[in-house]
Regions:
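Active-site microenvironments that recognize anionic phosphate/pyrophosphate groups
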Residues: 1-105, 111-184, 190, 203-215, ...
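Gly/Ser/Thr-rich active-site loops/lids in small-molecule metabolic enzymes
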Residues: 192-197
């Protein structure tokens, strides 16, 4: 994924520079699981090359680069959501061999499809049920509770980070916006900066421990019941 090895026909968009001087690059996935021409598996799959320097991992890059990466995610989500058939856009990253990374050069992926995954559908259904019963968002309530407890990791005006109750993985962390919004495109500039700071903090700690990890954004194209957040799940075995 270094600049000199990129196939021009795969480039979707360059960010931060022209030609081979880009900082972040969006590519069509060379071996996509979904395509706009496949009726049975409709969608788009892109690779986001997070840096042109293959000697760097994301955790080592400055906070402003994290913010730029989030802006790229926002841009790609907006572009892909223009296709009205798209119901779900997953942004995810696999870092390290134990997390399933097959390429050393740091990258993440954007997966857009016309199918809402069953687990996302179930989460939305439970969120709606909670809201009907309690007249509030379940995640907004969880944020308030966790910011007062021992699982709190980081907090500022815009974001909240905590280790979830009964974590699936050691050192798991969830990053939430305090403002209720349903997807990444709704982030304002201040929230992008705070989210970048929080993500840099979490990934830097995992990098120091030498842990592989996956991260993925929980979001939907449009459903106010959903509360946008990011799960970071370390893989230590």
């Amino acid at each position: 994924l270094c600049p000199e090895n990129i196939e021009e026909n795969l480039i979707v968009r360059r960010y931060g520079g022209q030609g081979k001087n880009w900082k972040i690059l969006a590519l069509k996935n060379k071996f996509p699981a979904v395509t706009p021409g496949n009726k049975r598996a409709y969608g788009y799959q892109e690779v986001i090359v997070e840096t042109s320097d293959h000697t760097k991992v994301l955790a080592e890059l400055p906070t402003k680069h994290f913010a730029k990466l989030l802006e790229v995610y926002i841009n790609r989500t907006k572009d892909l959501a223009k296709d009205k058939r798209i119901e779900y856009i997953l942004i995810f990253k696999n870092e390290g061999s134990k997390a399933g990374a097959s390429i050393v050069h740091d990258h993440s992926q954007v997966f857009a499809t016309d199918v809402l995954p069953p687990e996302v559908y179930e989460e939305l259904k439970l969120s709606k049920k909670y809201k009907l019963k309690n007249k509030s968002c379940a995640y907004c309530d969880i944020i308030k509770q966790e910011m007062k407890g021992p699982r709190k990791i980081f907090e500022d005006k815009h974001v909240a980070v905590f280790a979830p109750y009964a974590s699936e993985y050691h050192y798991e962390a969830w990053i939430f916006t305090k403002r209720h919004l349903d997807n990444i495109t709704k982030l304002n500039d201040s929230e992008v900066k705070s989210f970048a700071k929080a993500l840099k903090l979490v990934l830097s700690k995992l990098n120091k421990l030498g842990l592989s990890y996956n991260y993925f954004f929980h979001q939907v194209v449009s459903d106010n019941t959903q509360h946008f957040y990011l799960k970071v799940q370390p893989r230590d075995s």
